[in-house]
Amino acid sequence: MKRFLQFCLTLALLLAAIPSMAAVTVRGTVTDANGEPVVAAGVVEAGTTNGVVTDMNGKYTITVKGADSVLEFSCIGYETQSVTVGNRGVIDVVLEVATSFLEEAVAIGYGTQKKADITSSVQSVKSEDFNKGAILDAGQLIQGKVAGLQITLPSGDPTSSTSVMLRGYSSLLGSTAPLVLVDGIPGNLSTVAPEDIESIDVLKDGSATAIYGTRGTNGVIIITTKNAKRESPATVQYNGYVSASHWLNTPDFLTADELRAKWAEGWTGKGDISEDRKYTTDWLKEISRTAISHNHNLSIMGGTQNHTYTANLTYNDNEGTIKGTGRTNIRGRVQIAQYLFDNKLKLSAEVMADENNSKTGFNPGYTYRQACIQNPTQPVYIDNDPAKGYYETDGYFYDNPISYLNERIGMRRSRNVRFNGVAEFRPIEQLTFKALYVRKGQSSIRGNYNTHKDVSTTEQGLNGTASRGTSELVNDLLELSANYQQDFGNHHVTAVAGYSYDETTYESFSMSNQNFPTDAYLYNKMQAGMGLTEGTSSQESYKYNTKLIGVFARATYNYADRYLLMASLRVDGSSKFGKDHKWGYFPGVSAGWRLNNEEFLKDVKWIDNLKLRAGFGITGIDVNSPYQSLASMNYSGYAYVDGHWNPILVPARNANPDLRWEKKYEYNLGLDFAFLGERINGSIDFYRRDTKDALYNYSVPTPPYTYGSMMANVGHIRNQGVEVLVNAVPVRTRDFEWSTSVSFSYNQNRLISITPPKGSELSLSTNYFDTGYTGEPIQTSTHRVKEGWPIGNFFGLKSVGVDEAGKWVVEVLDEDGKVSGYDYAENANSSDWQILGNGVPDAFANWNNNFRFMNFDLAITMRGAFGAQALNFQKLFYGNPTIAYNVLNSAFDKIDVVDMTTGKPTGKTAVISDAQRYVSYYIEDADYWKIDNVTLGYNLRFKNAKILKALRVYGSVRNLATITSYSGLDPEIRTVYGDDGAFDPGTDDRDKFPTIRSFTFGVNLTF
């Protein structure tokens, strides 16, 4: 009986336990902070597809697996909450309103401001919206993301960086690059690893950038890095990827078989292309490869109540698609912060360091050109035997490209170190004092050596040539500022004032030598070359020091979240300008009106934000080089005095005490909007910016001046345009979400004036200047910059066709610039030149889409440029069958034969049989639309895991597809002018490192 009773008791206990292991039904109500029911909120059992939605009263009922189940409560506009069921049958939840994007803090320079309160043209991009894949620098992260910000990388060179221009050309001699700040400190787009960036804010109009004075004309890009938060657990993240790249397109030059077929058809060719040398060589294949690159980023961060720490290390090996090219980079960053005296004092210190190593022995673009034009029937080596040396001929500018790869050896190593310390003291809640000190050091060393086998040395009978150079830059920055904010009822006021001292010292040394006893020394034993004793070596050194001192202030006012005002002033002093104009004054002012908070719109619930903005600001442009206001002298020629030849010192630059800032005056009118719970938001901006006192070089009389030209402030440039941005979330459900962003920008540029005022000693022979250059053998300019014209105009002969013999026929102009007849291009002169197009796009458009389905995400970035033309240099030089090099297949295209009297087509066609000539036939429309970046990812989170918290794997394709009518390799062509200051946008250089397409596989791990 006892055993029976024990059995019954055990059975009863087991039966009693069954309900706790069975399904559990939970009921409850979901409300907001005001106690109002949240309708259609999702209630989901975590890790399953089991879910329900709340009814009109916010009530729900759901059956889950058991007590260990976790319920997730979510709704658009609210923060998601997770609750473990336990032994409860009723669970009521209060959802907190999600942080509005209008409440997000945006960096505006020397502080932050709520997006809703901003009265200037500012756009912010967060890390979750960055482009993915094999990203070169911060510029590529936001390429296609910011209206009006033109970011291009029209080169596959692994040592290149993105070119950036905002709202058009603002200077004739100055840079177009925006000021880049990394955590408030001047830097560049490569200062930090892309994986280490939290957000990027772009200040676009003058009212926003005026507080940066001389450095703010071209806009300001503010990069904020990822840093630990207080009381956050230690987190370790690894981000890595492997990428394979190849040329986007390959030019269609004749292969060996095609060349032999042309000979068989009766085409004889000229020079090096006229003889069958019995081999078959794919020269482009010989110099190229599929490039494999990899990147690894490791970071750790965490914090307690009183301190935070952040550390990261990145290694990048970027291999080039042309053999022998590549770059490796290693960089690290450590940041610590300590909070003292009840958080009244914050001390932080940061060290950043990086090292870049690249191969620079040969010019990859010129090597690519040589590979294009080589005879495909000739071998790489004599008799195809490397021991016998390279196969070379006596062709003009015609060298074996494999010789360049193997016999031109070089390196460049640069190291950068940045230390900064910050002290922030807050005696009261409303007032903060800040002191920032930064010291940056940059050093580089470079060396190049051409062996005794290189064509440049064999032609000159030399035993190797070498060059070596070093440079060092040290920058010190001190900034002291005070920040105040206070609320007085409906009045909110902020103010910041400060002082900035920025000093830079740069020095460099370089030398060259030749005739070395052995190639083994390379560039490492410069004294061994005989050029030192033969008098053929060279040495050069340089040093400069510049100072920039600034005092700045800004105040903002907000009344009842309706009326907004901002005013700023910066006073800058620069050592680069004349003694009478060292200082410049740069004010900015803007205002905003939030209509949605007015009584007449308060009841319109679908409007979340509707704000009118207007702003005006003046910014300055510093000259690129120091000492331009001072006279200088150089040696030129020799004089025979007292039996010796002595070098003669001659004037090289006039003193100009009136040299001063270029000033940009910018007006901006904008509208910010957000509708339907912020699911639709964006902005519209109209702007006009006038650069006055633009610097240019003018002729001056001698005497009284000692030199015949002088830089002076005379020019006037105007840009005006519109920018539109629309963000939307068309679909958002528990399992699927689609967000999209569309932006459009249009800019009109014009050179208003460069003519000196009447009575001035300055003079110009014309109101224009020609720029750009075709190179050998055409040797002519490609562009004209003229008063009243937009910058970027192609200028040359307009072709209408050819005659029956294949000679170019062009328009002839009368004195009024109108067509008066037709003639052969060889008979035309510069008076027949006319505008042939413009290399700067009128408009840019971007369309970004992000999709999420369950744990998958898909990002598609598309962008395009419209209204520009391009000069197809490859077609200009090699689309002609009369040259002595290999040619493009298009060289044999049939062109319309025209009547020499009317210029109209006769119905006949002919192949070109004329010298290479710069005519409009080679200028093409360059509109394009690119599917630029496609990334597919899969995400996993491990909530209860002790080690691995999250995993993401992804695949990405960059430069996937291009829609264009342009016949060249890539219609995305440099529009930012080069370091030489040439305004020649739209020139598709024949020496350009080919654009690449890359395929990337990556993984992100969070521990």
Cite the ranges covered by each PLM segment:
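Short, small/polar-rich motifs associated with maturation and membrane association
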Residues: 1-340, 345-354, 418-419, 707, ...
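Short, P/G- and charge-enriched loop/turn segments at secondary-structure junctions
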Residues: 208-209, 283-287, 654-656, 834-835, ...
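Short Pro/Gly-enriched beta-strand edge/turn motifs at strand-loop
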Residues: 276-283, 537, 828-832
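Short hydrophobic alpha-helical membrane-anchoring segments
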Residues: 12-23, 79, 359, 677, ...
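Surface-exposed, extracytoplasmic segments of Gram-negative outer-membrane nutrient-acquisition systems
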Residues: 454, 640-652, 690-714, 749-840, ...
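Hydrophobic beta-strand positions
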Residues: 30, 53, 179, 686, ...
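Extracellular/periplasmic, surface-exposed regions of secreted and cell-surface proteins
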Residues: 130, 177, 291-294, 329-330, ...
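A surface-exposed, glycine/aromatic-enriched loop/edge motif typical of exported proteins
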Residues: 246, 251, 256-266, 353-392, ...
